[in-house]
C-alpha cells in the first residue's frame, strides 16, 4: 500500500488496564475504500481496538494516525488533535446510543451544529439527505423509541456520517438484524466504501465478513493472529 493511499495507520499499539493486556503489538494500514472486518470472540479486543482508533480509550504504547490526526501512546491528545479526530472518524456503537429526547433528525444535526458550527438549516438539509440516502427519510421526525431496530441503526449510521468522516467504525452492527437486514447492511457498507470511505466493522459473523469485506482480521487476546482477504 502506497504511503499516500493510507487513511489509517496503526503502529505497535499496546493497551492495558491494570495487569490485563487488551491490545498487544497491533499494526494496521487501511486505504480509502477498504471494508475491514474484525473477527474474534467476545473480549478478544475488537471493540477496544475501535475505541482506541476513535480516541475513546487511551493506549500506552505505539501510535495511531487517522487522516490528519495523530495520537501517541502514553500522551494525552491535544484539543486540536481531538478536533481533527472528530472530523476524521465516525463511530456506530453496538447499541445505537441515540438521544431519546431528540428526534432522528435532531440526533444527526447535533454534532454538525455544536462541533462543526454549521448553521441549523444547513445541518438539517444535510441530515435529511443522509436519511434519504439510507432509506429512512420518512422517519426524520420520529423519536428513537418509535424506530425499529433497523431504522435506529440507520439513523445511527447517518449520525456517524454527518461530519463526513474518512473512517467509519462500526461495532457489531449486525447484532439486532435478521438475515435480510444483514444483507441490506452489507450492500450499504459496500456503497459507502465505493464512495471512498474506510470502514472497520467488528462482527462474529464470518460469512458476512467473507461476503462483504475485502479484508479480514482475526483478533484473539488482543493480538491480530490472522489476516485474509474477503470478497
Model-found features: residue ranges?
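ABC ATPase NBD coupling module
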Residues: 71-90, 120
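A short, proline-enriched helix->beta-strand linker immediately N-terminal to the Walker B motif
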Residues: 162-166
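Conserved ABC ATPase "signature" region
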Residues: 70-72, 120-139
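Conserved ABC ATPase signature
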Residues: 143-147, 151
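Helix N-cap at the start of a conserved alpha-helix in ABC-type nucleotide-binding domains
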Residues: 179-181
Amino acid at each position: 500500500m502506497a504511503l499516500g493511499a493510507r487513511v489509517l495507520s496503526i503502529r505497535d499499539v499496546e493497551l492495558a488496564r491494570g495487569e490485563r493486556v487488551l491490545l498487544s503489538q497491533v499494526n494496521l494500514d487501511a486505504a480509502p475504500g477498504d471494508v475491514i472486518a474484525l473477527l474474534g470472540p467476545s473480549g478478544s479486543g475488537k471493540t477496544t481496538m475501535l475505541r482506541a482508533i476513535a480516541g475513546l480509550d487511551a493506549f500506552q504504547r505505539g501510535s495511531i494516525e487517522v487522516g490528519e490526526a495523530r495520537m501517541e501512546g502514553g500522551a494525552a491528545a491535544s484539543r486540536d488533535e481531538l478536533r481533527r479526530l472528530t472530523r476524521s472518524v465516525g463511530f456506530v456503537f453496538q447499541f445505537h446510543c441515540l438521544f431519546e429526547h431528540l428526534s432522528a433528525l435532531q440526533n444527526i444535526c447535533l454534532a454538525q451544529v455544536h462541533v462543526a458550527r454549521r448553521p441549523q438549516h444547513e445541518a438539517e438539509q444535510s441530515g435529511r439527505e443522509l436519511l434519504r440516502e439510507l432509506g429512512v427519510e420518512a422517519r426524520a421526525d420520529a423519536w428513537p423509541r418509535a424506530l425499529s431496530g433497523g431504522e435506529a441503526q440507520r439513523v445511527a449510521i447517518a449520525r456517524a456520517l454527518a461530519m463526513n468522516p474518512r473512517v467509519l467504525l462500526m461495532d457489531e452492527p449486525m447484532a439486532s438484524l435478521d438475515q435480510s437486514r444483514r444483507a441490506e447492511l452489507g450492500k450499504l457498507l459496500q456503497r459507502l466504501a465505493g464512495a471512498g470511505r474506510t470502514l472497520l466493522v467488528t462482527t462474529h459473523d464470518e460469512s458476512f465478513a467473507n461476503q462483504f469485506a475485502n479484508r479480514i482480521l482475526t483478533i484473539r487476546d488482543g493480538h491480530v493472529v490472522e489476516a485474509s482477504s474477503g470478497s
